[in-house]
């Protein structure tokens, strides 16, 4: 199958700061019948180059917030041979040398929170995969110094967080995940309903 760049990757126009921040990440989470598992992004054939907007993870302008509100720092400025800080965290949870949970996500700095909370929902709280993925989330990224919570977080939990000194702010869509759970020899997949395009 042929692979060609997104039409907006090559342009002679000057694009506004943050333009590429709005482009989505394509993520695939899969488990094969023979037990092979993968959590990956798209790679251009024969190049090893991941096709995504990862270059946006560099600080375009140190001291200036990006689309997600992260303040850029000079140490993360774009330079030849450098890798940007990244929140991508495809995860495969193993038990007795077998995959039991495969999780990956999209959503910039919110990816780590979304993936971790999905894993905790399954491993610690023993939730079925659909409830684990759909569960309300929280996210804190240091700057801005507020704790984002989705609408489903109970009022008593919010009040408890505020009593501890957190500045709580309600936000929709704190990351999007795809997950596969293997339990009792059966495979269950779930694509996050926070995203319009669905898989699983």
Features from the language model and the residues they span:
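Proteins synthesized as precursors that undergo proteolytic processing into mature forms
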Residues: 12, 16-174
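In a subset of proteins, long, contiguous C-terminal domains/tails are tracked
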Residues: 156-200
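Amphipathic alpha-helical
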Residues: 1-4
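Alpha-helical and His/Cys-centered functional microenvironments
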Residues: 10-12, 182
């Amino acid at each position: 199958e042929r692979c060609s760049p997104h039409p907006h990757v090559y342009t002679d126009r000057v694009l506004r700061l943050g333009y590429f921040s709005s482009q989505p990440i394509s993520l695939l989470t899969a488990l094969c019948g023979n037990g092979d598992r993968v959590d990956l992004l798209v790679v251009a054939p024969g190049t090893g180059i991941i096709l995504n907007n990862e270059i946006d993870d560099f600080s375009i302008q140190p001291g200036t917030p990006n689309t997600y509100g992260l303040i850029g720092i000079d140490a993360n400025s774009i330079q030849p041979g450098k890798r940007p800080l990244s929140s991508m965290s495809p995860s495969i949870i193993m038990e007795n040398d077998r995959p039991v949970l495969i999780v990956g996500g999209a959503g910039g700095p919110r990816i780590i929170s979304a993936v971790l909370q999905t894993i905790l929902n399954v491993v610690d709280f023993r939730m079925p995969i659909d409830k684990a993925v759909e569960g309300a989330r929280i996210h804190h990224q240091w700057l801005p110094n507020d704790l984002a919570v989705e609408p489903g977080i109970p009022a008593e939990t919010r009040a408890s967080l505020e009593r501890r000194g957190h500045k709580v702010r309600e936000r929709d869509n704190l990351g999007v995940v795809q997950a596969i759970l293997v339990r009792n020899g059966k495979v269950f997949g779930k694509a996050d309903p926070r995203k319009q395009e669905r898989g699983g």
